[in-house]
């Protein structure tokens, strides 16, 4: 199979939405029957985002094969059917590590290792490898043109443009066309300078996607075309919209997919965007609204919980309601008490690390349990629910996780030291293991118990969800907790580890050790999120009753 490559760069400012634009174009091409994948090349030195602060970088998105990747891969999976893997995201740090490892082995036969050709060749190999088996591979280059960090990536894609030729490569550049209120017009000069910068390193863009808060007038499009040496039909206006799921239709309306397929000589059907039209209709026509309190420690940056936010919205579409997310810093609960939780239709405690704010999360779980308020715990959210139950129902005073208190008399949650991964390999960890890349990661089978809310949500007795954690329920306490009324509704592949818990006499109190938000999409949703939002709707109606 001959793979075509679309390279996506950004200029003027960061955060223009390269990932959304790339994913939206991929969605249109997929709707035309093409097999599409998307890659993200990140210019930072970290090997992966796994140990980066969520408040700096946003969430870490986990792929099926256990790669800890950039949150843009979450956008990719929400827009197209193709599942991402570790080949879809790599960093400068990963490239340098591999090149240096080869140098130590002697693979370069004593050569002087340089950015060109050794680093650029390694980048090109990764790009070509990631595109194998697909009709089209869209490659997003992180950062902004002009950044020193991005230069090796830009040089690599420049070389690929020459080596593969124009019939297999296309360069798409996102840029900002700001509107100046004082002048009463949009300004194209930043775009002209950005393209000049890009051309100075040998890349001539074929398509310009011009971002702004309004559509660009046709006369300004003509001006951009003239000064940037790009066909006028290839100057695409991408204005701000109230829903990112409207962007595929916006791009299609301007003929971007036709331009791409003709450039590549691809014969394919017209794009059918009816699924996206349905998503947009559901989003615009809710029959009600529920308020979900998200209790976490990274609440100052919503992107830290990007996939959870999106999964709640998707569940809202399924239940025909809009979901209002109220971010609650768990430390505020510790300081002010549970009155900050009043007026909610449900509580969600997402994953997290570290002791800060953990008691506030435990208080949130207790509030939900005692007030019959729908509760959904994810990863740490399951562990705090179990700790709360152990303390206040099972009579295990001062029960805790050894992550937060190594001297707790009742370590109901502890460091997992050994487990069997999805390939049947035995994985082992200990207290001194590195933080990066040492967690239980990736998609794993979960056995569900018949008659539970978990089995009801998944409409079966198994599910496959993705993990990212080091700590697990301590099996020593399972029998005592079960006797107190806790149901272990999901177990690992070998049935040795607790994957899900729930309360049978509660309207909806369900928690999982895995991260179901990573598999939610706007077209299909995710069973547990759909069940949680449905329970919030029912709680609200009963409350109003």
Curated annotation (Swiss-Prot):
One of its GO terms (cellular component) is cytosol. It holds the Pfam family CTP_synth_N. Pathway: Pyrimidine metabolism; CTP biosynthesis via de novo pathway; CTP from UDP: step 2/2. The keyword Iron does not apply. Mg(2+) binds at residues 72, 140. ATP binds at residues 15-20, 72, 239-241. One of its GO terms (biological process) is 'de novo' CTP biosynthetic process. Allosterically activated by GTP, when glutamine is the substrate; GTP has no effect on the reaction when ammonia is the substrate. The allosteric effector GTP functions by stabilizing the protein conformation that binds the tetrahedral intermediate(s) formed during glutamine hydrolysis. Inhibited by the product CTP, via allosteric rather than competitive inhibition. It comes from the Bacteria. Residues 291-542 form the Glutamine amidotransferase type-1 domain. L-glutamine binds at residues 352, 380-383, 403, 470. HAMAP family: PyrG (MF_01227). Belongs to the CTP synthase family. Catalyzes the ATP-dependent amination of UTP to CTP with either L-glutamine or ammonia as the source of nitrogen. Regulates intracellular CTP levels through interactions with the four ribonucleotide triphosphates. This is CTP synthase.
